[in-house]
C-alpha cells in the first residue's frame, strides 16, 4: 500500500531552515562541529519518528549535540515542530536515509547512536534491511568514536533476538540488556510515542546497549 503524503509537508518542512537539512548533507561530513559551532559530543537517532525522544534528550542535555534522521517527511515535520516550539539550539534534522550515513559522517565523528522501534522487516529475505544487520553495524562501527555506543529499543522479540546475535557476532560489547524495560530497574529511560502506546497496552519493551570495542 502506497503511503499517503501530507499535502504541503515538503514545503513546510524545508521552511525550517534552522533545523532541517536535506540537500548537500555530504558537505558537512567531518564538519558537524562547525555546523553546531562547538565541539560537544554528537548523538544521532536513526528513524526519529515524531521526535518526542530526541527533543526530550536535547532539552535535558544542552551540552550534547543531537542529529535526528528520518525519511518520512510527515512525521519528521512533527519532530521539527517540537524542536522549534522549544527553541532548541542543539539539534538538527536530516531528511535522509540511514543507508547513506557514510556519506554524511566522517570516521569516529559520532559518540552515540539511538535506534528505537525500527521496522522489523520480518521476512528472512528482508534481513539486510534491518538496522541492526551486520551491514549496518559495520557502518556504525566506522562512524562511532572509540568506545562509542548503540542504544537499541524494540517491541519485537524476534528482532531483538536477531539484533543480539548480530551485535555479538560483530564483536561489540553487549550491556544493560532488558527483556521488559517497563518493569526493570533502568531509571533513565526516555520514551518515544510508540513506546508510550505499547507500554499502556502492557506490551514488553526490549532494550540493549552495544559498546564499540577498540
Swiss-Prot record:
InterPro entries: SAM-dependent_MTases_sf, tRNA_(Gua-N-7)_MeTrfase_Trmb, tRNA_methyltr_TrmB_bact. The keyword Transferase applies. GO terms for molecular function: tRNA (guanine(46)-N7)-methyltransferase activity. S-adenosyl-L-methionine binds at residues 45, 70, 97, 119. It comes from Clostridioides difficile (strain 630). Catalyzes the formation of N(7)-methylguanine at position 46 (m7G46) in tRNA. Belongs to the class I-like SAM-binding methyltransferase superfamily. TrmB family. Gene3D superfamilies: Vaccinia Virus protein VP39. Keywords: Methyltransferase, S-adenosyl-L-methionine, Transferase, tRNA processing. It comes from the Bacteria. Substrate binds at residues 123, 155, 192-195. It catalyses: guanosine(46) in tRNA + S-adenosyl-L-methionine = N(7)-methylguanosine(46) in tRNA + S-adenosyl-L-homocysteine. This is tRNA (guanine-N(7)-)-methyltransferase.
